[in-house]
Amino acid sequence: MKIFFITSNPGKVREVANFLGTFGIEIVQLKHEYPEIQAEKLEDVVDFGISWLKGKVPEPFMIEDSGLFIESLKGFPGVYSSYVYRTIGLEGILKLMEGAEDRRAYFKSVIGFYIDGKAYKFSGVTWGRISNEKRGTHGFGYDPIFIPEGSEKTFAEMTIEEKNALSHRGKALKAFFEWLKVNLKY
C-alpha cells in the first residue's frame, strides 16, 4: 500500500516511514502547502487540513499535527508549538521554565487519514518532563528537551526505533495501523 504524507517536515517523514515501512506500507512525501489554522485543538487543525486538501492531492493521504503541552505554562505552547519553535526555540522554552519545579509536559499527535471520500483520525499522547538543558542530536523540534516517562533520555538521545516505541506519534501510528489491519484488511 502507498500513502501520501503531506508534510514539509523530513523528521516526521523519517519516523512515519520507519514505523509503517516495517509493515510494507510505502510512505511518499508530498510537500503540498496548505493553510494551518490556529485552533484550540489539534483535531480541529487536522480536520481543516484534510478538508482543504481533499481533491487537491492524490489518495490515500495523511497529515499529522502535534504539540507540546507544558503543565506549568498552562498547556503552552500546545497547538502553537510549531510557531513557538520557529520564534523562541528551545532556548526560549527553557528560559520560560527557569526555576519551575513542575516540569511535567505531554506531547500529543493527531494523524488524519483520507481515503475513498472519508476522513479518519488517530491520536497518541506521551507524558514526560522538560529537561533543564538541551540533550541529544537525533530527532527534531522539541526532542532535545523532552524526557518521556520511564526514561532518563530525551527523545533526541534515542534512536528512531526507541523514540517510536514511546512517542506520541508512535502511539498514533500504532492506532492507525491497527485500524488499517481491521478496516482495509492490510
Swiss-Prot record:
Positions in coiled-coil regions: none
Which superkingdom heads the taxonomic lineage of this protein's source?
Archaea
| Catalytic function, reaction form | XTP + H2O = XMP + diphosphate + H(+); dITP + H2O = dIMP + diphosphate + H(+); ITP + H2O = IMP + diphosphate + H(+)
What EC number(s) does its UniProt record assign?
3.6.1.66
| Catalytic class of the enzyme | hydrolase
Q: Where does substrate bind?
A: 7-12, 66, 140-143, 163, 168-169
Needed cofactors, names only, are: Mg(2+); Mn(2+)
Q: Which UniProt keywords apply?
A: Hydrolase, Magnesium, Manganese, Metal-binding, Nucleotide metabolism, Nucleotide-binding
Database matches in Pfam families: Ham1p_like
CDD domains (UniProt xref) = HAM1
Q: How is the cofactor bound?
A: Binds 1 divalent metal cation per subunit; can use either Mg(2+) or Mn(2+).
Tell me the active site.
Answer: 65 (proton acceptor)
Which GO CC terms are listed, alphabetically? cytoplasm
What molecular function does GO assign, one term?
ribonucleoside triphosphate phosphatase activity
Residues engaged in binding Mg(2+):
36, 65
A GO BP term, please? purine nucleoside triphosphate catabolic process
The family classification in the record reads: Belongs to the HAM1 NTPase family.
Q: List the HAMAP family.
A: Non_canon_purine_NTPase
Its quaternary organisation is: Homodimer.
Q: What does this protein do?
A: Pyrophosphatase that catalyzes the hydrolysis of nucleoside triphosphates to their monophosphate derivatives, with a high preference for the non-canonical purine nucleotides XTP (xanthosine triphosphate), dITP (deoxyinosine triphosphate) and ITP. Seems to function as a house-cleaning enzyme that removes non-canonical purine nucleotides from the nucleotide pool, thus preventing their incorporation into DNA/RNA and avoiding chromosomal lesions.
Write the protein's name. Answer: dITP/XTP pyrophosphatase
Task: Specify the species.
Answer: Pyrococcus horikoshii (strain ATCC 700860 / DSM 12428 / JCM 9974 / NBRC 100139 / OT-3)
Q: Print the organism lineage.
A: Archaea, Methanobacteriati, Methanobacteriota, Thermococci, Thermococcales
